[in-house]
Swiss-Prot record:
GO BP: any one term: heparan sulfate proteoglycan biosynthetic process
Source organism of this protein record: Mus musculus
Xref: InterPro entries: Heparan_SO4-6-sulfoTrfase, P-loop_NTPase, Sulfotransferase
The keyword Membrane appears for this protein: yes
Protein name, UniProt field: Heparan-sulfate 6-O-sulfotransferase 3
Length: 470
């Protein structure tokens, strides 16, 4: 009797166990929810409700589901902030192309990018045309083209001038002999120079000649140096210069004058003559201004250090040269600043002392010339070691208010040119990669049918040979 009862009891128990096991396999979400429910009871912590299946949700009333709290959907892709905003040229990309994504990750980092990895955010302030931002000079070094370097005092021009004669990769490099201040920079196979600068032709137009002097002097000087048989060919003059933060430049010039520099041999030629002593008086009675204090340096109202960058880049003939009675001061300053901006914008190239690597990048892309060694950014200078208070700094900015406006304009134009050139280069590289991948795909497409036909021919030949043998 007991054995028969055990057999009848065993059958429903096994059936129930089978149903439970099958239910777990058919509905695994129930298992997880049941186990989670048991864990919640043990831990006493509240957990968010599981999202039901669409079938169960369809069976429930609509208003009931609207009242229930819903979990947000899982984010797709990386979280916000992990990558930058896509560039405009990325909008026409094929998002499903894995080769494009892999190659995008292989870009070299910007040497001047911040160490934390965040991209520097540049907000343009001035509106420039595409022509103003696009700078590519078809410099013909074998022809008659000449690069003219306008060297403004204390802007890093000496270092940049040495780069021009010693650091450019050329077919015929400049010949610089030890003990000589000037180098010989001849065109390939000719005895003519392609560079007009302190370290190639010397101060042929005067010590630190400005824009007014160079534009009236350089063409005549180069015609004398050139061969008469080449005078029938056209010649292009490409003017370049370097600018610097006005406060740092002013302090550097003060320290230089304090050590005995004068530049009193400068000609300051304008409209065919040099200024009279009344038009351009000196700030010191002796041979030099050695040991001058910063206060004395700033107190001289006709100190040429004031707004030097604007004066050396402007066309002084527009304001009567150095004759301050030619027009009122306000009108004179407006004309000088606007003239300096226009001349700077129309130059073939200008660099900034504070951005050495970007200066090198833009020069190389503008003239299609490569430097041998990279430029170095020296942040410790004599000007940086000068400790001045806020009042003295403000006074220097007031004395150089025209240079301050010019530098803001120049820095904005410089940054826009840099980003524009980078963008164009990035687009060209991307187009080149696309073309290479397209050629590879076409090559594979033409190669595979030939291989298939070759394989078919081999199989047919083997089969026929076997039939012959049979």
């Amino acid at each position: 009797m007991d054995e028969r009862f055990n057999k009848w009891l065993l059958t429903p128990v096994l059936t129930l166990l089978f149903v439970v096991i099958m239910y777990q396999y058919v509905s695994p979400s129930c298992t997880s929810s049941c186990t989670n429910f048991g864990e919640q009871l043990r831990s006493g912590e509240a957990r968010p409700p599981a999202v039901p299946s669409p079938a169960r949700r369809a069976q429930a009333p609509l208003d009931e589901w609207e009242r229930r709290p819903q979990l947000p959907p899982p984010p797709r892709g990386p979280p916000e902030g992990s990558r930058g905003v896509a560039a405009p040229e990325d909008e026409d990309e094929d998002p499903g192309d894995p080769e494009e994504e892999e190659e995008e990750e292989e870009e070299e980092p910007d040497p001047e990018a911040p160490e934390n990895g965040s991209l520097p955010r540049f907000v343009p302030r001035f509106n420039f045309t595409l022509k103003d931002l696009t700078r590519f000079v078809d410099f013909n070094i074998k022809g008659r083209d000449v690069i003219v370097f306008l060297h403004i005092q204390k802007t890093g021009g000496t270092t940049f001038g040495r780069h021009l004669v010693k650091n450019i990769r050329l077919e015929q490099p400049c010949s610089c002999k030890a003990g000589q201040k000037k180098c010989t920079c001849h065109r390939p196979g000719k005895k003519e120079t392609w560079l007009f600068s302190r370290f190639s032709t010397g101060w042929s137009c005067g010590l630190h000649a400005d824009w007014t002097e160079l534009t009236n002097c350089v063409p005549a000087i180069m015609e004398k140096k050139d061969c008469p048989r080449n005078h029938s060919h056209t010649r292009n003059f490409y003017y370049i210069t370097m600018l610097r933060d006005p406060v740092s430049r002013y302090l550097s010039e003060w320290k230089h004058v304090q050590r005995g520099a004068t530049w009193k041999t400068s000609l300051h030629m304008c409209d065919g003559r040099s200024p009279t002593p009344d038009e351009l008086p000196t700030c010191y009675p002796g041979d030099d201004w050695s040991g001058v204090s910063l206060r004395e340096f700033m107190d001289c109202s006709y100190n040429l250090a004031n707004n030097r960058q604007v004066r050396m880049l402007a066309d002084l003939s527009l304001v009567g040269c150095y004759n301050l009675t030619f027009m009122n001061e306000s009108e004179r300053n407006t004309i000088l600043l606007q003239s300096a901006k226009n001349n700077l914008k129309n130059m073939a190239f200008f660099g900034l002392t504070e951005f050495q690597r970007k200066t090198q990048f833009l020069f190389e892309r503008t003239f299609n010339l490569k430097f041998i060694s990279p430029f170095t950014q020296f942040n410790i200078t004599r000007a940086s070691n000068v400790d001045i208070n806020d009042g003295a700094r403000q006074h220097i900015e007031e004395l150089n208010f025209l240079d301050m406006q010019l530098y803001e304009y120049a820095k904005d134009l410089f940054q826009q040119r840099y980003h524009h050139t980078k963008q164009l280069e990035h687009q060209r590289d991307r187009q080149k990669r696309r073309e290479e991948r397209r050629l590879q795909r076409e090559h594979r497409a033409h190669r595979w049918p030939k291989e298939d036909r070759a394989m078919e021919g081999t199989v047919t030949e083997d089969y026929n040979s076997q039939v012959v043998r049979w």
